[in-house]
Regions:
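A solvent-exposed interaction/effector surface
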Residues: 1-146
Length: 146
């Protein structure tokens, strides 16, 4: 399921997203609904070619996970039908490659945060996943300045 965590420098990447907040029990349904909405609207946006699917999230607030569910795109665009332009951030981040199904995400994120603690790195609270063609995913946690 896992590989080692590494620190990487990432570039800002434009995204097309649906902004949502969801309780953990509803994450699969919320993800599917947001991705269906995005698929319906994305071809009409002036965002250029679509890249990999992604989800950006910040720590839960009152039991709800704030998320930007979307895809990497070539350029920013005007909002349309609830799809807004956003970015994956630039900076130093912890990178972790998860192998296997999405049910492994909680354990994978725990691995990232445990590694940060053991290595004395402070996450900034901005995290994201970039999904591959299979169920594998690349996980990133932006680092606060050490």
């Amino acid at each position: 399921m896992t590989s080692a965590c590494t620190i990487v420098t990432v570039e800002r990447q434009p995204t097309a997203v649906v902004r949502v907040e969801a309780v953990f029990a509803e994450l699969p349904q919320v993800q599917r609904a947001a991705r269906a909405r995005l698929a319906a609207v994305l071809p009409a946006l002036d965002a250029g070619p679509a890249g990999a699917a992604c989800t950006r999230w910040t720590p839960p607030v009152d039991g709800k996970l704030p998320m930007e569910i979307g895809t990497i795109v070539a350029r920013p665009f005007a909002a349309r039908e609830g799809i807004v332009s956003s970015t994956l951030p630039a900076g130093r981040a912890v990178r972790f490659s998860m192998k296997g199904g999405f049910e492994n995400l909680p354990l994978a994120w725990q691995t990232v945060f445990d590694w940060c603690k053991a290595e004395n790195h402070a996450p900034a609270g901005i995290n994201w996943e970039i999904y591959g063609a299979t169920e594998d995913a690349e996980l990133f946690a932006l680092l606060a300045y050490d």
